Amino acid sequence: MSQPDNHSSRSASVSRRTSETDISIDLNLDGTGTHSISSGVVFLDHMLANFSKHAQIDITLTCKGDTDVDDHHSVEDIALVLGSALLQSLGDKKGIKRYGWSMIPMDEALARCALDLGGRSYSVFNATFNRSVVNGFSTEMVEHFFLSLSRTLHANIHISILEGQNTHHKIEAIFKAFAYALKDAISISGTGIPSTKGVI
């Protein structure tokens, strides 16, 4: 996997190829939310486009996966590569706010996300869905997406659905809540490492 293109630009390019998926991603943390996403899973494209737009992170992502089997490998591996790219683009994390949280409504649904970019991978997910599949996307993969992302981003991510019935609304609210929480956490608020340890 590549290193950040330039520390000051907070960008990264990462690729990963296995017998199940072939993924490449370019991102810029300090972008405007422009995106070109082709994951092979249409509903995931929609969620990642929302993430890019609301986090204001520029993303170009392509994935060729074994979706003839199911969506599991593509969704999981995209999360792993996205987490790696986000981590690399953060560099030494000097000056970042580190913590972020958001609460986002979408009609009857209400999602909350809180996260810590302090280097400790952990994921807590509290949400249930009325449908098992949305347009080829297995709803059980929402939790697995954020678990996989937390591992390679080295982040602590807590996600909860507080209200809601419609499965699409709940999932979209989750991705948007994560977007705003991450946007908050990666924002520059100082010059040093935000930890008494001196490293995160």
Swiss-Prot record:
It comes from the Bacteria. Pfam families: IGPD. It is found in: Cytoplasm. GO terms for cellular component: cytoplasm. Pathway: Amino-acid biosynthesis; L-histidine biosynthesis; L-histidine from 5-phospho-alpha-D-ribose 1-diphosphate: step 6/9. Coiled coil: none annotated. PROSITE patterns: IGP_DEHYDRATASE_1, IGP_DEHYDRATASE_2. Keywords: Amino-acid biosynthesis, Cytoplasm, Histidine biosynthesis, Lyase. One of its GO terms (biological process) is L-histidine biosynthetic process. The keyword Amino-acid biosynthesis applies. Its EC number is 4.2.1.19. Its main location: cytoplasm. GO terms for molecular function: imidazoleglycerol-phosphate dehydratase activity. The keyword Oxidoreductase does not apply. It catalyses: D-erythro-1-(imidazol-4-yl)glycerol 3-phosphate = 3-(imidazol-4-yl)-2-oxopropyl phosphate + H2O. Belongs to the imidazoleglycerol-phosphate dehydratase family. This is Imidazoleglycerol-phosphate dehydratase. It comes from Prosthecochloris aestuarii (strain DSM 271 / SK 413). The gene is hisB.
